């Protein structure tokens, strides 16, 4: 007489489906956490050590070398104390007047930019703070997508959480673009005025702050009436600008 063979319990179809869905989701979540950890590790490292390059600098150098293989960037890091206080005030007055008050996002500026974009029926003004601009420069491309904006938001939160306002401003002034192949305020001061960043006058600082939105364009159009008028407005706002 044959013994009856034990039967395996049938795996239910819903359980198979849930397992099939759960594994890719866990893999995706793990990949996302690793990706964000890469940003976080860099930011924590920069609390004590200064970045020597940025994603934007690398992109610009790649483009420049397509035309000239021997092209190089002009860039020299200088510490916070070696940067003119006039320049710090000018940049805050021009780019982020509430820099010391917000936590990375200036909602009043965002609202103003949104209304301006609706009025002009195009995406022009962005209302980005210094922290948001730093996030883009350090890690991201210049594309305007929802995915890039979400990464920018997360990186901005990390910058504000792990770096002081003083450190954020110091890195920002040292890595943003100021002209064609010109990065950082020391290279900019020497390129435009033949002096160090520490020696910039209020008028020179205001002019440099005025070209930040489109530095390559203004590099060859330094006396445009619109630009000079903007620099005068920034100059008038220097006394009210608060720096860390």
From Swiss-Prot:
Single GO cellular component term: peptidoglycan-based cell wall
SUPFAM superfamilies found in the cross-reference section: Lysozyme-like
Keywords of the record: Cell inner membrane, Cell membrane, Cell shape, Cell wall biogenesis/degradation, Glycosyltransferase, Membrane, Peptidoglycan synthesis, Transferase, Transmembrane, Transmembrane helix
Compartments where located: Cell inner membrane
GO biological process terms, semicolon-separated: cell wall organization; peptidoglycan biosynthetic process; regulation of cell shape
Pathway: Cell wall biogenesis; peptidoglycan biosynthesis
Keyword flag NADP: no
Gene3D superfamilies listed in its UniProt record: Biosynthetic peptidoglycan transglycosylase-like
Catalytic activity: [GlcNAc-(1->4)-Mur2Ac(oyl-L-Ala-gamma-D-Glu-L-Lys-D-Ala-D-Ala)](n)-di-trans,octa-cis-undecaprenyl diphosphate + beta-D-GlcNAc-(1->4)-Mur2Ac(oyl-L-Ala-gamma-D-Glu-L-Lys-D-Ala-D-Ala)-di-trans,octa-cis-undecaprenyl diphosphate = [GlcNAc-(1->4)-Mur2Ac(oyl-L-Ala-gamma-D-Glu-L-Lys-D-Ala-D-Ala)](n+1)-di-trans,octa-cis-undecaprenyl diphosphate + di-trans,octa-cis-undecaprenyl diphosphate + H(+)
Main location: membrane
EC id: 2.4.99.28
Membrane-spanning intervals of the chain: 25-45
Topology class, membrane: Single-pass membrane protein
One annotated GO molecular function: pentosyltransferase activity
Source superkingdom: Bacteria
InterPro entries, alphabetized: Glyco_trans_51, Lysozyme-like_dom_sf, PBP_transglycosylase, Pep_trsgly
Pfam family, one: Transgly
Record function comment: Peptidoglycan polymerase that catalyzes glycan chain elongation from lipid-linked precursors.
Membership in a protein family: Belongs to the glycosyltransferase 51 family.
Protein name: Biosynthetic peptidoglycan transglycosylase
Protein species of origin: Nitrosomonas europaea (strain ATCC 19718 / CIP 103999 / KCTC 2705 / NBRC 14298)
Organism ancestry: Bacteria, Pseudomonadati, Pseudomonadota, Betaproteobacteria, Nitrosomonadales
């Amino acid at each position: 007489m044959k013994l009856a063979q034990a039967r395996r319990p049938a795996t239910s179809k819903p359980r198979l489906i849930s397992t099939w869905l759960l594994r890719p989701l866990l893999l995706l979540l793990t990949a996302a956490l690793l990706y964000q950890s890469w940003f976080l590790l860099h930011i924590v490292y920069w609390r004590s050590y200064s970045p020597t390059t940025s994603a934007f600098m690398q992109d610009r150098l790649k483009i420049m070398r397509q035309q000239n293989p021997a092209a190089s960037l002009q860039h020299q890091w200088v510490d916070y104390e070696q940067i003119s206080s006039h320049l710090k005030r000018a940049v805050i007055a021009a780019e982020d007047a509430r820099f010391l008050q917000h936590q990375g996002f200036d909602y009043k500026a965002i609202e103003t930019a949104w209304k301006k974009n609706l009025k002009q029926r195009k995406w022009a003004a962005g209302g980005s703070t210094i922290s948001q601009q730093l996030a883009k420069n350090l890690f991201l491309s210049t594309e305007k997508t929802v995915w890039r904006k979400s990464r920018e938001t997360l990186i901005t939160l990390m910058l504000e959480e792990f770096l002081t306002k003083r450190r954020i401003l110091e890195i920002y002034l040292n890595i943003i673009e100021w002209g064609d192949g010109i990065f950082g305020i020391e290279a900019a001061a020497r390129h435009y005025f033949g002096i160090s960043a520490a020696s910039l006058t209020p008028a020179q600082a205001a002019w440099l702050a005025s070209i930040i939105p489109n530095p390559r364009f203004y590099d060859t159009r330094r006396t445009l009436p619109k630009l000079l008028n903007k620099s005068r407005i920034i100059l008038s706002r220097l006394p009210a600008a608060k720096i860390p």
